[in-house]
Amino acid sequence: MSSLAATVQDIFDEPGCAKNGSKSEAERRNGCTRQLQPGSAAGGCAFDGAKVALQPFTDVAHLVHGPIACEGNSWDNRGAASSGSDLWRTAFTTDLSETDIVFGGEKRLCKAIKEIIDKCDPPAIFVYQTCIPAMIGDDINAVCKAASRRFSKPVIPINSPGFAGSKNLGNKLAGEALLDYVIGTREPDYTTPYDINLIGEYNLSGELWQVKPVLDELGVRILCCISGDGKYREVASSHRARAAMLVCSKSMINVARKMEQRYGIPFFEGSFYGIQDSSESLRQIARLLVERGAPADLLGRTEAVIAREEARAWAAIQPYKPRLEGKRALLMTGGVKSWSVVSALQEAGLELVGTSVKKSTMEDKERIKELMGQDAHMIDDMTAREMYKMLKDAEADIMLSGGKSQFVALKAAVPWVDINQERCHAYMGYAGIVKLVEEIDNSLSSPMWEQLRRPAPWEALAKAREQMQSMAAIAGDPVLAETARRARNICVCNRVDLGTIEDAISVHGLRSVAAVREHTNAAGGCCQGRIEDMLMSEPSDMRQAAE
């Protein structure tokens, strides 16, 4: 069995994965995902997964061995941020041509490694395998080993050709490369009882820096972050940490489990999205560190910091809650965000009508049920047409998703907030939840949406003509006129007509928007103003009878 095939089989037999553990031996041998034919299009491939997992290491030169399109399509597609070197943003590729494919690209790869060292002198070079050199038999493991000896510098092979499998498999192959070639290869300058690793955190839009000040105040040192704002020397010495927090289990569970197995570093899966989840993660970090020998007063200091930060965050989001209360949100993301962001949205007063679980683990789905109830609407896969219909039918007031589906929301004239890795704002930690609530409020309150929903002038003219003709037809028939009035929908969502609301108010003596929602199909969001007007205009004798 080849080295790549053996590594893939080892990943598929991951004991830390609950889904894998529930399978039979034969099912585990078949693997978690169907391997792809070389060159086939299937969204994010294994190479893309490895690249986005490791590229946030800021001082490393990332060299893609393959055609230039592989590097061009994957460059900077994860909005990570750096506090130091910006070498990671420089695109290096061997740019294989037809001649290289015929005669082999190993010499070209060796030449590229030498050129990078001569010009940039990075502490390490990560070399990524792609489909074409893998198919023609280029041995990047041997080339990297020879280059490391020749230049006395770590040259790490990332053997993750795109046809090996999905983007998620590529994340894990990247983790295996770190375990095999990087982690444990050097010692830290010093250690403390408060050293931790953050695994699967990518510092999107610099959101790690919103959590780091809180950890610094507690005296907790991030020995290594894999891989957001990470440095090569930090990940090489990360085996000396006292505890670890796994931020995105789907991508790096193999790294956390094997570091616990090899170096005795306990880990837990947590999240810094939302107030309650941030607090619980801080408590877990403190508990693990105390169990590993840190002073016991860390627990008390952690609770004091949590109380202060929670009070600040709740006070900051309080002004937004009246405007967000009862608004319905559709969350189209995946992985850890499928449940961690749910908690944050609920804290802001939003109602979740559905969350995507396309890239979520069984543990993620169980957490969603804990937060949203056993009947939670978990969306495994939704086409753009289905998403558009759901938004157009006003089943959600706002959608939070990635850039791929933003145009569906815009076409449906529904507010949209970017929640995926391309986003421009940091939503992690106590300050992050406040920023998320602010962005949601800005999107929902924008006057653009009301203008966008208005019909075009020529459509309005045609509609006016139809209405005039209809009014002329029913002008002489009072019964027909009343029927037409009651059949009118009360707002743009078209969920319920005027007569249904009037009957419900009259028969049941309803006095609030919430009561009307309970007895009818009214959404209560976009319909709220019209329902309030109807309640206020109710005849006084009927109001007194209801009271």
Swiss-Prot record:
Keywords: Nitrogen fixation. Pathway: Cofactor biosynthesis; Fe-Mo cofactor biosynthesis. Gene3D superfamilies: BFD-like [2Fe-2S]-binding domain, Nitrogenase MoFe cofactor biosynthesis protein NifE, C-terminal, Nitrogenase molybdenum iron protein domain. It comes from the Bacteria. Belongs to the NifD/NifK/NifE/NifN family. This protein may play a role in the biosynthesis of the prosthetic group of nitrogenase (FeMo cofactor). This is Nitrogenase iron-molybdenum cofactor biosynthesis protein NifE.
